[in-house]
Amino acid sequence: MKKILILPLLLFFLVQGSMAQTPKWVEKAKRAVFSIVTYDKNDKMLNTGNGFFVSEDGLALSDYTLFKGAERAVVITSEGKQMPVSLILGANDMYDVIKFRVAITEKKVPALVVAKTAPATGADAWMLPYSTQKSIACVTGKVKDVSKVAGAYHYYTLSMHMKDKMVSCPVMNAEGQVFGIAQKSSGIDTVTTCYAAGAAFAMSQKISALSLGDAALKSIGIRKGLPETEDQALVYLFMASSSLSGEDYEKLLDDFIRQFPANADGYLRRANYYASKGKDDQTWYDKAVADFNQALKVAQKKDDVYYNIGKLMYAYQLSKPEKTYKDWTYDTALKNVRQAIAIDPLPIYIQMEGDILFAQQDYAGALAAYEKVNTSNIA
């Protein structure tokens, strides 16, 4: 009888011990882990893998290999909801990490906090697999070794058994913060040892002004984000104008304006893009006018906006349109340029004044403008 009672008690304590080993934060943290499906240019499934959110507005991390050659990608949350990957925000093919944004369909999503400090050798670690079940069996282990990456970041060797389906799952510390992105085991001991790229290192990946030439990013067909600073983003826009398709360039302009709504250059560039499409459909000119008006509202240097409006109208008239759009005449172009000159008489503005007067066959006025330019500091 005693033996019969002891067996259930032993099982009870074993279950209780197993549950005690699972940290309290696991239940909440597991909801930040998702599955990813990538598709090629023929919209055929390319790869499947894992990733996880690191911000409630849809910022996420995964492995670069999963996205290589992909034209689109979809994440599937632990609740089974599908959301598209909208932007690639940085990648490193050497350490196989990628940062991207998901177009979330909710106000916010569950997200993990990226650890600010690296765990010490010997520290406990937990790997959270993707799961649609209520219960989750996280893998436990230890940090075996910590090595430096790119100066301030880290790469980890873990004493932990990992299955292939756990690649790019988050590796957590005792506080429930993510410090690593699980990577495939390699080498002699793949049973008890696996690796993790630093989550902070993955977060440091970004788009720069020169990213258009980055081979790793070029191998991904999904749209790229903009650099985080205005100056870098403007250089990126300039370079993209000659290398992207018209449709992709327009989307990039929209992104710039969303990211930097107080920067007049975004509206000016998009206005010029709209105007270039207006020959066959004049509603594009309406859009250009709306952007010019917005540029005037936000610009700190309104003379630059007036100059660009005049310059565009001048170029429009030089193209000899069959029917002039509203007031886009040489006279209106001249009016805008002279408003720019009234604010700041820069030689480039006066040069444009001369060009417009010359086009109007006001040669005396054009000569007077050109003579001013010739006596300026740019002559």
Write out the residue ranges for each language-model feature.
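Short coil turns that delineate tetratricopeptide repeat
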Residues: P261, Q300, I343-P345, T375-I378
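Residue-level recognition of tetratricopeptide repeat
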Residues: N272, S276-K279, K311, L318, ...
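A conserved glycine-rich beta-strand in the N-terminal activation segment of trypsin-fold
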Residues: Q21-T22, Y39-D57, D63, Q82-P84, ...
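Structural motif corresponding to the intra-repeat A-B loop/turn of tetratricopeptide repeats
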Residues: S243, K277-G278, Q282, Y316, ...
